Amino acid sequence: MKNIALIFAGGTGQRMNLISGMPKQFLLINDKPIIIHTLEIFSKHQEIDGIVVVCLKEYINDLHCSIKQYSIKKIISIVEGGDTGQKSIFNGLDSIKKYSKINPYIVIHDGVRPLITHDEISKGLSCAYLKGNAISISKATETILYNEQEASILNRDKCFHVKAPQIFQFQDIYNLHMMAQKDCFEFIDSASMASHYGKELYFVECSNNNIKLTTPKDFYMVQALMQAQTIESIFGV
């Protein structure tokens, strides 16, 4: 397997403040769980050979049922998540160790980013083939204030949001996780981890529509954008 998508669906979605307590990745948009929308995109991409999903333990059976219901292909395994996002990603990587001799490219993506496109995945893979990694970014659309000791306004033209997918060769990202465990460091994402350990990163631009569903506002934005895509595909407008 040359390319394996590692989809993180292990979050509890506390910032969504859901009365039901259901994790955000299982919320429905167009009568389909958000995680399934995301998995469909990767399963239909010609360059993705297999998919590993990291999921909350108590929802693994539900995910198995949804994958069967919507006929999602290329699933290698569903892995139990850890206490943190970083530990969850490592659990996914650990399940891929059997392919380590091939040293596949690992396409790390959030299960709650269902608006990633095939073209954006392809651009990331092309960059990773040439340079060893690829980090998705989008242009900052609002002014950013940096405030550590003395507040300063950053030049928005030089600011970007770091998003996903983030693509690394297996051995590189696995070794980075091992170093982070040894040093007892927790990072917000793989790009931050790689940067901390001095790895040169390469960037590919994606659309600002590649939203990570974190808050109720994000849910309504993603829902509206997906409905707009459906209308466009039907009527060509």
From Swiss-Prot:
Protein name (record): D-fructose-6-phosphate cytidylyltransferase
Catalytic reaction(s) noted: keto-D-fructose 6-phosphate + CTP + H(+) = CDP-6-keto-D-fructose + diphosphate
Enzyme nomenclature, EC number: 2.7.7.-
GO MF entries: 2-C-methyl-D-erythritol 4-phosphate cytidylyltransferase activity
InterPro entries from the UniProt entry: IspD/TarI, IspD/TarI_cytidylyltransf_bact, ISPD_synthase_CS, Nucleotide-diphossugar_trans
UniProt KW Magnesium keyword: yes
Gene: HS5.18
GO biological process: isoprenoid biosynthetic process
PROSITE patterns registered for this protein in UniProt: ISPD
Cofactor(s) the protein requires to work: Mg(2+)
Entry's family note: Belongs to the IspD/TarI cytidylyltransferase family.
Keywords: Capsule biogenesis/degradation, Magnesium, Nucleotidyltransferase, Transferase
Pathway, per record: Capsule biogenesis; capsule polysaccharide biosynthesis
Origin species: Campylobacter jejuni
Taxonomic placement: Bacteria, Pseudomonadati, Campylobacterota, Epsilonproteobacteria, Campylobacterales
Superkingdom classification of source: Bacteria
Function comment: Cytidylyltransferase involved in the biosynthesis of capsular polysaccharides. Catalyzes the formation of cytidine diphosphate (CDP)-6-D-fructose from cytidine triphosphate (CTP) and D-fructose-6-phosphate. Shows less than 1% of activity with ATP, GTP, UTP and other sugar donors, such as D-fructose-1-phosphate, D-glucose-6-phosphate, alpha-D-glucose-1-phosphate or D-glucitol-6-phosphate.
SUPFAM superfamilies reported for this sequence: Nucleotide-diphospho-sugar transferases
Residues carrying the site annotation Transition state stabilizer: 15, 24
